[in-house]
Amino acid sequence: MSMIPLLSSVLLALMLFLPSTALAVETGASLFQNNCASCHPNGENIIRRGRTLKMKALTKRGLDSSEAIAQVAREGIGQMSGYADALGEDGDVFVAEWVWQQAQKAWTQG
């Protein structure tokens, strides 16, 4: 009988966590489409070849986490200016987590 409260707690935690995770992914994707995709379609870079959002290019520049990508989204790097104002509060985190997930999947959709 002691398993029921434990299972209920786990189920409640999952129900509370999963919708926010789905919202963060949707928000990150939307922010990327609205602010980044014109220069970075499918993780490419139309301004500077080789400065893509693909895993190999990211890690080569030391951008090996969503936190590092969030900093670039917020503050900019090289020719790219920061987008803190455009992305809004926590937008850098949402878009960076989405970009990091896409890089891990080699930017394949589905």
Give the ranges of each region predicted by the language model.
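N-terminal export/targeting leaders of redox proteins
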Residues: 1-25, 105-106, 110
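Generic hydrophobic secondary-structure packing signal
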Residues: 20, 24, 69-72, 92
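Soluble non-cytosolic domains of exported or imported proteins
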Residues: 26, 63, 86-90
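Local sequence-structure signature of Cys/Sec-based thiol-disulfide redox active-site neighborhoods
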Residues: 26-34
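Gly/Gly-Pro-rich "capping" loops immediately C-terminal to redox-active cysteine motifs
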Residues: 29, 41-71
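The canonical Cys-X-X-Cys-His
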Residues: 33-42, 95
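Axial heme c-ligation environment in periplasmic c-type cytochrome domains
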Residues: 47-56, 72-110
